[in-house]
């Protein structure tokens, strides 16, 4: 998004639980990889990097850095209902593309991993409906607001 049409990141909120993918950084490139990860995730100041215990599918428990949304950030939206954020996602675009494209990319990654999230599915339905109403020809253009 942009300052005029801010997008919405889909981030973790403190205190919840989630299912996801944990990545182990290779020892030989740990410092370089962690530096890249840190720069990418911390550039906006939206996250609180937090050490968390993760329960892996194989029964192991590991410690990992998890980037949790900072509720004090000025762009934080506490109301995560689909009817509130779907219009923002459907309308927002920026130099890297549309916010809807970001959402659809996340959907595809979750499908590849065999994961499903009911809240995300509700959001996808709402955004697709808004886009269909505003782009009847099916061509996704940056921002309609």
Which residues are covered by each model-predicted region?
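Glycine-aromatic micro-motifs
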Residues: 1-145
């Amino acid at each position: 998004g942009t300052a005029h049409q801010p997008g919405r990141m889909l981030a973790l909120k403190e205190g919840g639980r989630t299912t996801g993918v944990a990545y182990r950084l290779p020892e030989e490139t740990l410092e370089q990889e962690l530096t890249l990860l840190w720069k990418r995730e911390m550039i906006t100041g939206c996250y609180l990097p937090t050490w968390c215990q993760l329960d892996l599918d194989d029964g192991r428990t590991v410690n990992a850095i998890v980037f949790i949304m900072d509720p004090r950030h000025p762009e934080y939206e506490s109301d995560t209902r689909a009817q509130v954020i779907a219009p923002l996602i459907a309308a927002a675009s920026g130099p890297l593309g549309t916010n809807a494209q970001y959402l659809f990319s996340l959907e595809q990654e979750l499908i590849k991993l065999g994961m499903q999230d009911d809240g995300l599915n509700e959001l996808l339905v709402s955004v697709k409906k808004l886009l269909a109403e505003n782009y009847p020809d099916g061509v996704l253009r940056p921002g309609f607001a």
